[in-house]
Amino acid sequence: MSKEKFERVKPHVNVGTIGHVDHGKTTLTAAICTTLAKVYGGAARDFASIDNAPEERERGITISTSHVEYDTPARHYAHVDCPGHADYVKNMITGAAQMDGGILVVAATDGPMPQTREHILLGRQVGIPYIIVFMNKCDMVDDEELLELVEMEVRELLSEYDFPGDDLPVIQGSALGALNGEEQWEAKIIELAEALDTYIPEPERAIDLPFLMPIEDVFSIQGRGTVVTGRIERGILKVGDEVAIVGIKDTTTTTCTGVEMFRKLLDEGRAGENVGALLRGTKRDEVERGQVLAKPGSITPHTKFESEVYVLSKDEGGRHTPFFKGYRPQFYFRTTDVTGDISLPEGVEMVMPGDNIQMVVELISPIAMDEGLRFAIREGGRTVGAGVVAKIFA
């Protein structure tokens, strides 16, 4: 029992495999689990159990994802692997599986392929901060120069999308070789694990970030003032803190004079908790659902941004028909819908259900946002798409 307790204090990091179809993402996932279980203890997983990924629904979107776990001496990893290309696209855009780092798998026999590029671009758009490269199938390439050439190509491709291509770790290995217990290739899996430990920094915990709470409801309490309720997304709210009310209207600041949870008064509310915050001197009609309460200066309201969007297919309950420029749906951010105009990339006339697309959105009223914020696209309360803010313009 004491051992189990000790394990739990290890830092937790979320990673995943990305890359072109058949380059060996799932085989690598199995090889990591198996090799690390052999060396450091833990549960081995075979290819079949990972490849048979269960379907999940995230905001109405069907995604097949396999979740595996493994340990290094320093950390505990949660790792996602998807069977199909479409699953990766959906996963990255919805943030169903947030990654602190990605393992880009490239077959040495093929070099970078179209989906290699697309996954790198998506990684950039959705904010995967770190990428480590695993060059797979190196046991099938005899020519040392060819391996160097592929490595150079991959590094250049990553640099093209603003990843530090020259500096990031590239490990040349064979996932199948490691899975079959061949020592020289098992050593490469250990090398990959060491790269994960050293190259991907420990993610900041939600509680250590600046305070932010999306406002879900507003009440006025006779003689005490206005209370806003919501679930704290990040940081800590203490009684006496100055807070900003951001989005929809002009930003205002006030002081939090009380924090309560389940009708009990607290000194503070923390990330993940549902609380009510009493605001000094704020009138009931000055705040509304859809705004956020935040540490002053930590987040700003915006109306225009570039986004990466996945459009639900008909089977997922999405649209049955394409949409064109001039489409004006609602964009659902955190707790509220805001109407917006879209512009499509040059040369794109229409967007079909099931597509993923980059679009520039201009909202009719400002919303508190950072790059990486997720949203849904809705028509009359029905979700027809999912997106992520890639770049803020105004």
UniProtKB/Swiss-Prot annotation:
Pfam family, one: GTP_EFTU_D2
Subcellular location as annotated: Cytoplasm
ATP-binding listed as a keyword: no
E.C. number(s) listed in UniProt: 3.6.5.3
Gene Ontology CC: cytosol
Annotated region (G3), positions in chain: 81-84
Region span, G2: 60-64
Superkingdom to which the source organism belongs: Bacteria
Primary location class: cytoplasm
Protein residues bound to Mg(2+): 26
One Gene Ontology MF term: translation elongation factor activity
Keyword Protein biosynthesis: yes
Catalytic activity: GTP + H2O = GDP + phosphate + H(+)
Region (G1): 19-26
Record domain tr-type G: where: 10-204
Region feature G5, mapped onto this chain: 174-176
Family annotation (CDD domains): EF_Tu, EFTU_II, EFTU_III
Keywords from the UniProt entry: Cytoplasm, Elongation factor, GTP-binding, Hydrolase, Magnesium, Metal-binding, Nucleotide-binding, Protein biosynthesis
Binding positions for GTP per the UniProt entry: 19-26, 81-85, 136-139
Region annotation G4: where it falls in the sequence: 136-139
Function: GTP hydrolase that promotes the GTP-dependent binding of aminoacyl-tRNA to the A-site of ribosomes during protein biosynthesis.
Subunit structure and binding partners: Monomer.
Family, similarity comment: Belongs to the TRAFAC class translation factor GTPase superfamily. Classic translation factor GTPase family. EF-Tu/EF-1A subfamily.
Alphabetical list of HAMAP family matching this protein: EF_Tu_B
Name by which UniProt lists this protein: Elongation factor Tu 2
Organism: Vibrio vulnificus (strain CMCP6)
Organism taxonomic ancestry: Bacteria, Pseudomonadati, Pseudomonadota, Gammaproteobacteria, Vibrionales
Gene behind the chain: tuf2
